[in-house]
From Swiss-Prot:
Record-stated family: Belongs to the bacterial ribosomal protein bL19 family.
PANTHER family: LARGE RIBOSOMAL SUBUNIT PROTEIN BL19M, RIBOSOMAL PROTEIN L19
Classification via InterPro entries: Ribosomal_bL19, Ribosomal_bL19_CS, Ribosomal_bL19_sf, Translation_prot_SH3-like_sf
GO molecular function term, any single one: structural constituent of ribosome
Protein role: This protein is located at the 30S-50S ribosomal subunit interface and may play a role in the structure and function of the aminoacyl-tRNA binding site.
Entry keyword Hydrolase: no
Entry's Gene Ontology BP terms: translation
Record protein name field: Large ribosomal subunit protein bL19
Key words of the record: Ribonucleoprotein, Ribosomal protein
NCBIfam families: rplS_bact (TIGR01024)
Length: 115
């Protein structure tokens, strides 16, 4: 059992910033097309965090042209270049699935007040 934990620790990334549900983040994906490589940015609200060792994931939701788009991001994937926290949100839940049914200004997350 100890061998598995050692291998998982070697595969984990250490450059992931701390964030929580409700925060707005930018995820920079490394896209390989043929021999070319480019970076694609996905910015949205974190609606779910699944914690784990190497299988930790987050679900990020954004509205694109009036359509809700959700993307499940494996945190320790080599295809994720880096993650950047844009702003912190004030929510009282850890899973924000209720945002899927809200439209317009009701779907906004209030910014966290820093005193």
């Amino acid at each position: 059992m100890d061998i598995f934990k050692k291998i998982e620790r070697e595969q984990m990334r250490l450059d992931i910033p701390s964030f929580k549900s409700g925060d707005t983040i930018k995820v920079y994906f490394r896209i390989v097309e043929g021999e070319k490589e480019r970076i694609q940015v996905f910015q949205g609200n974190v609606i779910r965090i699944h914690r784990g060792t190497t299988n930790a994931t987050i679900t990020v939701r954004k509205i694109s042209d009036g359509v809700g788009v959700e993307r499940i991001v494996p945190l320790h994937s080599p295809l994720v270049d880096h993650i950047e926290v844009v702003s912190e949100g004030r929510v009282r839940r850890s899973r924000l699935y209720y945002l899927r049914n809200l439209r317009g200004n009701a779907a906004r997350i209030k910014p966290k007040k820093i005193y």
